[in-house]
């Protein structure tokens, strides 16, 4: 942790972009259920696997950049493609790019790509999601998507609507 903070302190005037991904099961909200009048329904969700819609994005201050919605789970190939084709082109000045240590993040390759475009790459210390402010955004996003599902939208359309109005 100390090393991470020392390295970060070397860039006092460089903007930081935090990047991360999250996923939402399409069975997040049930439109119909039964319970006594006036009571909420609580039920177990079956062990069945449902389709997953995932999102990867960056956050600079309170602004979300380069969001990508995709079906399924993240792979190294998809992450590199998003990083090269969406994230890096959206950064118009040098940034410190900070991300977690997920297994599918090929750190050496991501560092090389960042440096080639004039950016700095800094992974978080292991097991430190509390340092990543985009985690708070994901929590808000999931709460808002759940609210939008109550209006009859699909998870996909709720996510698209949220990013358009954010």
Language model segments and positions:
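Short functional hotspots at interaction and active-site rims
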Residues: 1-166
């Amino acid at each position: 942790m100390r090393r991470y903070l020392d390295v970060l302190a070397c860039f006092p005037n460089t903007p930081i972009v935090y990047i991360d991904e999250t996923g939402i099961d399409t069975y997040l909200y049930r439109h119909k259920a039964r319970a006594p009048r006036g009571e909420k329904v609580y039920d177990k969700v079956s062990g069945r696997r449902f389709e997953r819609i995932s999102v990867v994005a960056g956050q600079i201050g309170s602004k979300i950049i380069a969001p990508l919605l995709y079906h399924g789970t993240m792979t190294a190939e998809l992450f590199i493609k998003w990083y090269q084709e969406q994230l890096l082109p959206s950064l118009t000045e040098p940034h410190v790019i900070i991300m977690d240590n997920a297994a599918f993040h090929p750190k050496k390759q991501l560092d090389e790509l960042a440096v080639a475009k004039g950016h700095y790459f800094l992974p978080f210390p292991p097991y430190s999601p509390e340092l990543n402010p985009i985690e708070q955004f994901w929590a808000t996003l999931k709460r808002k998507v759940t609210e939008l599902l109550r209006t009859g939208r699909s998870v996909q359309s709720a996510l698209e609507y949220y990013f358009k109005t954010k």
